[in-house]
Amino acid sequence: MFGMLRALKTHVEAPIVVATRAASTNAEKLEEIRERLAKGPNFQDFVQNPDNSRSEWENYEGKLRREKGEEQRLRLPPWLKTTIPVGKNYAKIKAQMRELKLSTVCEEARCPNIGECWGGGEHGTQTATIMLMGDTCTRGCRFCSVKTARKPPPLDVNEPVNTATAIASWGLDYIVLTSVDRDDLPDGGSKHIAETVREIKARNSNIFVECLVPDFRGNLECVETIANSGLDVYAHNIETVEKLTPYVRDRRAHYRQTLQVLTEAKRFNPNLITKSSIMLGLGETDEEIESTLKDLRTAGVDCVTLGQYMQPTNKHLKVIEYVTPEKFKHWEERGNELGFLYTASGPLVRSSYKAGEFFITSILENRKKRQNATELSKE
């Protein structure tokens, strides 16, 4: 009997000893891996190589344009590689977005500049772009990664107050409100957007508010509602040149309709700053870009941004061309020559990218120019 118990004890203890040794070995291996990871390159090194200097940009010999009929995607050039988002302010904003069930176009549209805008950069203006009326759009533009549906969920009646409450706690200098298209609503959601603006201004009258809004299918009553809501900047994107509009944008969006919306917004409120944005790299020509810029100026648009189109998923339009930083610099200079209050042009520039910094810097520069001109006239 005792012999059987000793044998059983031996059989029980043996697996325990083996398991303990295995656990010890695994722990040592895990510690070794952690040490190697700590000393080696991290994930951010793979996302952005610190050696990607301007000389590397200039010496880049990769293919920048896809030929007609060519299916293979272009390789991403070095000037389009960005850092992953980090920082306390970034984490704070993201956490509150989740808590208050708010959406941002920064996340939904997979913007590459989210960390820089939310964090404010080293000396920059903190900017966030909140997407109102949910995360589902009634339109299906071929460049956009936002979800689509014919009848999205109903509006959240608490969203205007929740949005204003969050913004007041962040201490932002500049807020951009954008929205999905809501063709399923009689007013396209214009009253909802206007109410949000008023709630924000009630809590902080000094914050700059920009609204990047839909075309409301050309309904000028909706445009007037937004224009007189108390916002500072009325933005509506033309997106691309006239020839490519039917191919790039939803069939309900029209090039001339966009120009009319921008023109009428200024008429309803002459004190507004109006703004629009153009994506490059979809196959447009220089002549077509020039024509679009002139059309925007004729419509009274004050500010324009130009940025590189980047394909969000395999289901979206392919990039035809990666435009060089030098070419973007050319369009910035050309925009200034045409009389825009400011032109933000660069590969990673988006409609609301560092909107506050570009806007405020431009305003200050223009004030300084006027001051210098006044001093010269007195001499």
Curated annotation (Swiss-Prot):
Keywords for this protein:
4Fe-4S, Iron, Iron-sulfur, Metal-binding, Mitochondrion, S-adenosyl-L-methionine, Transferase
Binding-site list for [4Fe-4S] cluster 2: C137, C141, C144
State the organism's lineage: Eukaryota, Metazoa, Ecdysozoa, Arthropoda, Hexapoda
Q: Where is the signal peptide?
A: none
Family membership = Belongs to the radical SAM superfamily. Lipoyl synthase family.
Pathway-wise, it operates in:
Protein modification; protein lipoylation via endogenous pathway; protein N(6)-(lipoyl)lysine from octanoyl-[acyl-carrier-protein]: step 2/2
Cross-referenced SUPFAM superfamilies: Radical SAM enzymes
Q: Where is the Radical SAM core domain?
A: 122-341
Quote the gene name from the UniProt entry: Las1
| Protein name, as recorded | Lipoyl synthase 1, mitochondrial
Q: What is the top EC class of this enzyme, as a single word?
A: transferase
Q: Which GO terms describe its cellular component?
A: mitochondrion
Query: Organism source for this protein?
Result: Drosophila yakuba (Fruit fly)
Q: Which co-factors does it depend on?
A: [4Fe-4S] cluster
- Per the UniProt record, which EC number(s) apply here? 2.8.1.8
Which PANTHER family does this UniProt record tie to the protein?
A: LIPOYL SYNTHASE, LIPOYL SYNTHASE, MITOCHONDRIAL
Cofactor stoichiometry and binding remark: Binds 2 [4Fe-4S] clusters per subunit. One cluster is coordinated with 3 cysteines and an exchangeable S-adenosyl-L-methionine.
**InterPro entries per record:** Aldolase_TIM (IPR013785), Elp3/MiaA/NifB-like_rSAM (IPR006638), LIAS_N (IPR031691), Lipoyl_synth (IPR003698), rSAM (IPR007197)
